[in-house]
């Protein structure tokens, strides 16, 4: 149940009941990921993987008055699992992996939250890539083992702006800065904190050893 309350904990009001996923044997599947954005709750639900034709359900729930709409039904392939991480919302779009089974690479989608349709799909997305940020229809992200990248939606061109051969990078973009926390391997032996300006000039670096 989606509930609204005052900041002091009073005034609980039920807005909507979250959609349930029903298995063929009658069992109900609950839970998923929740993202609040611009007056909506975006809900990526756990699919009922026991059903032979399951796919990831994505819902948009209006906080006023609680109307629920399922998104991307025509675009998400069958047997698409729930993405455990890598989901982000930016500039009216949701970016999310579409994992199939246990593949190391999978499709990664850009979905328009207004139209409810997927507009862009990267077919070779590595699960260690970072989340995506959209500024003025240019996508910013880190590709594992490649570096910091920009994808211009107008031209369909990806550019590696800062080559960086690291196993993983958690990236945060602001208006003026880029902050990274990189890891050297799956064992996480060394963590490096980095700060750049938006022209990719290094401003600071701190190396942390695993304790």
Predicted regions and their residues:
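Residue position within the beta-strands of beta-propeller blades
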Residues: 1, 42-45, 95-97, 140-142, ...
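N-terminal "mature head" segments of proteins
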Residues: 1-27, 31-34, 204, 209
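Structural motif
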Residues: 2-3, 49-60, 102-110, 145-150, ...
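Short loop/turn segments that connect beta-strands within beta-propeller blades
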Residues: 6-10, 62-66, 112-116, 152-156, ...
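Beta-propeller fold detector
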Residues: 13-19, 69-75, 119-124, 159-164, ...
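Repeated scaffold domains used in trafficking and secretory/extracellular systems
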Residues: 23-37, 77-90, 125-136, 164-175, ...
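Solenoidal tandem-repeat scaffolds enriched in leucines and small polar residues
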Residues: 34-37, 43-108
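Hydrophilic extracytoplasmic domains
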Residues: 143, 149-211
């Amino acid at each position: 149940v989606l509930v609204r309350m005052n900041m002091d904990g009073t005034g609980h009001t039920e807005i909507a009941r979250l959609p349930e996923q029903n298995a063929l044997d009658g069992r109900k599947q609950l839970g998923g990921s929740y993202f609040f954005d611009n007056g909506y709750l975006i809900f990526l639900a756990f699919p009922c993987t026991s059903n032979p034709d399951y796919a990831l359900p994505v819902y948009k729930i209006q906080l006023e008055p609680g109307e629920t709409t399922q998104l991307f039904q025509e675009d998400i392939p069958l047997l698409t699992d729930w993405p455990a991480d890598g989901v982000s919302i930016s500039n009216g779009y949701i970016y999310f992996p579409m994992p199939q089974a246990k593949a190391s690479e999978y499709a990664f989608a850009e979905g328009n939250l207004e139209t409810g349709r997927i507009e862009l799909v990267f077919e070779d997305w590595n699960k260690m890539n970072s989340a995506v940020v959209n500024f003025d229809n240019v996508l910013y992200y880190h590709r594992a083992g490649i570096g910091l990248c920009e994808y211009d939606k107008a031209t369909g061109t990806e550019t590696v702006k800062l080559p960086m051969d690291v196993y993983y990078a958690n990236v945060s973009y602001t208006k003026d800065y880029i902050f990274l926390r990189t890891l050297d391997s799956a064992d996480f032996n060394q963590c490096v904190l980095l700060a750049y300006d938006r022209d990719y000039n290094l401003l600071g670096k701190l190396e942390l050893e695993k304790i």
